[in-house]
Amino acid sequence: MTMHEALRVRLTETMGPVTFEVLAPHLERDAVVIVAPKLALLEAAIAVAEDESELVDGWIQSGTFRKPSAAERARWKEQMGREWICVVVQPFVLVQDPPTDSDATSFG
């Protein structure tokens, strides 16, 4: 198994749902990054882990990979039951809204 394949397996195994309570300490240290639904969360995590800076910079420039705004953070705090799909790529915590039935095949 190549290093890339091993990374993919490790990240897949650690990816899962989280609530605001779990995200809160990471929000406090400004480590949470929102991955837009049009990007596969796993592919974004791999790009960060493998330091694909040009690719990630493009996502940042397009707004598909960004920090949550103050308004989003406040809204999230009020939505205690809400869940996101999350994967940790130190020092970042990447989050994405769970896929809906219509786009479940494009997730991960």
Please state what every model-predicted region is.
Residues 1-50:
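N-terminal, charge-rich interaction modules
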Residues 28-30, 51, 57, 97, ...:
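Acidic-enriched, low-complexity/disordered segments with a strong bias for Aspartate over Glutamate
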Residues 37-39, 60-64, 91-93:
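Generic secondary-structure microfeatures
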Residues 43-76:
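Short, hydrophobic/π-rich interface segment
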Residues 67-108:
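Short, compact, well-ordered microdomains
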